Amino acid sequence: MNEQYSALRSNVSMLGKVLGETIKDALGEHILERVETIRKLSKSSRAGNDANRQELLTTLQNLSNDELLPVARAFSQFLNLANTAEQYHSISPKGEAASNPEVIARTLRKLKNQPELSEDTIKKAVESLSLELVLTAHPTEITRRTLIHKMVEVNACLKQLDNKDIADYEHNQLMRRLRQLIAQSWHTDEIRKLRPSPVDEAKWGFAVVENSLWQGVPNYLRELNEQLEENLGYKLPVEFVPVRFTSWMGGDRDGNPNVTADITRHVLLLSRWKATDLFLKDIQVLVSELSMVEATPELLALVGEEGAAEPYRYLMKNLRSRLMATQAWLEARLKGEELPKPEGLLTQNEELWEPLYACYQSLQACGMGIIANGDLLDTLRRVKCFGVPLVRIDIRQESTRHTEALGELTRYLGIGDYESWSEADKQAFLIRELNSKRPLLPRNWQPSAETREVLDTCQVIAEAPQGSIAAYVISMAKTPSDVLAVHLLLKEAGIGFAMPVAPLFETLDDLNNANDVMTQLLNIDWYRGLIQGKQMVMIGYSDSAKDAGVMAASWAQYQAQDALIKTCEKAGIELTLFHGRGGSIGRGGAPAHAALLSQPPGSLKGGLRVTEQGEMIRFKYGLPEITVSSLSLYTGAILEANLLPPPEPKESWRRIMDELSVISCDLYRGYVRENKDFVPYFRSATPEQELGKLPLGSRPAKRRPTGGVESLRAIPWIFAWTQNRLMLPAWLGAGTALQKVVEDGKQSELEAMCRDWPFFSTRLGMLEMVFAKADLWLAEYYDQRLVDKTLWPLGKELRNLQEEDIKVVLAIANDSHLMADLPWIAESIQLRNIYTDPLNVLQAELLHRSRQAEKEGQEPDPRVEQALMVTIAGIAAGMRNTG
């Protein structure tokens, strides 16, 4: 195992050395010496040397304003390079890939060894695989796109340097290229100057498709096919592509006034334009490759006399002309020109698929399967995965916006105020209107700007080509009328098909009521007729954890899913659970495999639909090889969860979870909501107020500009606590509840739950991961530097709680130290701490200076502000999950 890390360590130290040379060239020897001194002090402080820890604090406190930025940037850039080395390590033959035999092969062998599973059953499970990844632009992808491109190239250099047979001159060339890339990064400003617009965010998503997924998805399918052939003697059908990508960028308007109907329309056009651009490159390759003459009578009939000489090329050139005409029309539309639709405009995937598939069948029939299964097969699979829209989008809006729109309408019509009606009256009105043949919206009505926006969005959905919008998600859904209201608004816009509408249940109360709401909906005949046996429900992870703490939230999520699965099964409805997880633990983030196997039995029958957020998109899909590895992990987990579902928890375990949930929620809310010192403590001990200055995402950090913790979005709430290393939202309440149950004499039962129930063991594993990343001496330093002395006792109390929590978690898990069963992650955290610690100490110092200046009525020093932004980005890179 250590050999495995030595490759990682040597890459990290080599990149560090090059960064050091870059700093020396740019700023001179003295700055490099300063950085080196700090690094050595940090390393020895981590090893337990208290004198050096004190010296580290003093050194960083005494930096002049001119030294702040270079030091902050040095450690921040180092962490970006370490992340790049680690990303490469996860796919390099000397690293993780070496000790990680193919995950799909492993899963298939495991399934084949189960006497109760026939090969036919496994095959059917493969055929019903469905994985939809929903890319969201959370304001947590801190790293700028230009730097991401440079890091991708650094990765490519590391890969080539790993080649044993490389000639000296090639080695020198690669090292020179690495130096150039690292110098370019050093001389690039790592902090965006302007907030990205929703269109910028969408373009970031398209860049991920182009740079990674476009190649990664066909590679993943080749890998899957190879493993299935080897283990089951089964070939994937050409049209079988179990993975789809959807995006919230440009569609998610919940709390983001910058996402308007016009923006959504623009992003839909842009997405189609990008698809034509990428498919044109593919077709260009096929025009040059498919020069064959021999073809089936069917293909020759299709091309006629004109194309008989080179039938495949003839078809490809025709398709190329259609793509070019489509692209030109989309380009004009994006510029705001209104043009008639050209002959042959591509709007549906079948129009792309048919000519390509005709070529494929003909090549196979004429004994040219080797050619058919080359680039042509990859393009066919891209048509199935990306198609004409490239990525579909979800629309998301808050339930009250629909209620307010209908209220305004009913008041105008003089039939009362929809907003004040009872739930029964709302439902009666909605069902009546949904069944009515006449339109509800009056022609000359002039609604308010807010209502007009809701109606315009429905109009955009109705006009978009079918298949380009995946679902309409209703956040803060609480009642059946919330769902029916959206169906009515869509009907009024003239939508010609049943759009999937997914309620999102996200607070503790809403999760607890989710099953009742869905049961009522499924009892409405009109609704049953509309959905045709399919229902999507979204489970919110971040808001429930912010509302009730992580233990109560995760149990409420489990129970809501469990009840919904059983209700839909009984009603004969195929349920797709849509998981709104984040990258960090407080937002439901867990290693994919463990997280999926810890869900209730049957939760993946309708496939997996999950959000992939901000910075996690880059960690999981930043390179084609990593895409293959991430998709394979998901595939293995879905197959395993469906064929070897986890056991139903015992009744006594459920009772213990109920108890843990109540105790932990009370403790969590006791601090967060009821302790009068809590909000002032939070505001001063973390960079929460300063985070608002970072031009991260296009949406505001708060739903309402004033207000306490409840008005903060879940992401800044977690982001702030991650910065000061207390990681509070991801553990508060959980350990205390466990301790109480242990004191009641149930430790052996908790140990059994940890051993035999994946849901519970995953919860504990996630707590261990958080505790491994948290750091009490740093959290204490923030208090000393930034918090009013009267609030120190609260900080001490919270840190003591965490210490107690760590002990109880280790006792139940029977571990001697944190992360004992995941040494690779422990190693990775230790490697980073040496570089993250100075950034934390420096951040506390910068916050101190910035707030002092504000108190004294001075203008903030731009050097301090800039260095502060860099520490925020650097710590986010060091923690590997932001919010």
Swiss-Prot record:
Its EC number is 4.1.1.31. GO terms for molecular function: magnesium ion binding; phosphoenolpyruvate carboxylase activity. The enzyme has distinct binding sites for each of the allosteric effectors such as acetyl-CoA, fructose 1,6-bisphosphate, guanosine 3'-diphosphate 5'-diphosphate, long chain fatty acids, and L-aspartate. The keyword Ligase does not apply. Gene3D superfamilies: Phosphoenolpyruvate/pyruvate domain (1.20.1440.90). It catalyses: oxaloacetate + phosphate = phosphoenolpyruvate + hydrogencarbonate. Keywords: Allosteric enzyme, Carbon dioxide fixation, Lyase, Magnesium. Its cofactor is Mg(2+). PROSITE patterns: PEPCASE_1, PEPCASE_2. The keyword Zinc does not apply. One of its GO terms (cellular component) is cytosol. It holds the Pfam family PEPcase. The active site is at residues 138, 546. It is an enzyme of class 4 (lyase). GO terms for biological process: carbon fixation; oxaloacetate metabolic process; tricarboxylic acid cycle. Belongs to the PEPCase type 1 family. Homotetramer. Forms oxaloacetate, a four-carbon dicarboxylic acid source for the tricarboxylic acid cycle. This is Phosphoenolpyruvate carboxylase.
